[in-house]
């Protein structure tokens, strides 16, 4: 979101503070370093305590979908290969664990061993985050997702 704000400000001819990119990088990089595979299993654990120890070991679909979108935005903004690698890592994890080829849709939650679970919230999620993870990487950082999509809709 910080990179979308930066791009939107620039598109509007307004000053975009340098800290927007720096903070976007720091947030993403820290999440990858502290939360991915921290308990010995791949994927982002849901929560960490103040000492960066896992509190909730579950993996939630929306966290991984948002990570894909963030990695794609950082790749678009910086061109740095590490963000493409994270994008691919996240999508590989989603494809192997969250997408349900039998029942359709995505599993909302995985347990600490990356098996479908329903401890935090049972059932299938809405597709809001999944759609964003699919659509955002193919769009520019500005204008917004809604504006980008609206500009490509044919009125009947």
Residue map of PLM features:
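Glycan-recognition and catalytic cores of secretory/periplasmic carbohydrate-active enzymes
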Residues: 1-156
């Amino acid at each position: 979101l910080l990179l979308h704000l930066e791009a939107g400000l620039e598109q509007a001819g307004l000053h975009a503070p340098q800290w927007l990119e720096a903070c976007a990088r720091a947030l993403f990089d820290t999440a990858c370093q502290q939360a991915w595979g921290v308990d010995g299993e791949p994927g982002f654990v849901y929560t960490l305590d103040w000492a960066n120890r896992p509190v909730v070991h579950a993996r939630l679909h929306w966290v991984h979908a948002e990570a894909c979108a963030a990695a794609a935005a950082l790749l678009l903004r910086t061109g740095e290969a590490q963000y493409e690698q994270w994008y691919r890592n996240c999508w590989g994890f989603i494809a192997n664990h969250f997408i349900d080829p039998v029942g359709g849709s995505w599993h909302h939650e995985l347990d600490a061993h990356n098996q479908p679970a329903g401890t935090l919230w049972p059932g299938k999620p809405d597709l809001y985050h999944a759609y964003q993870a699919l659509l955002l990487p193919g769009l520019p950082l500005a204008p917004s997702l809604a504006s980008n999509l609206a500009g490509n809709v044919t009125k009947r």
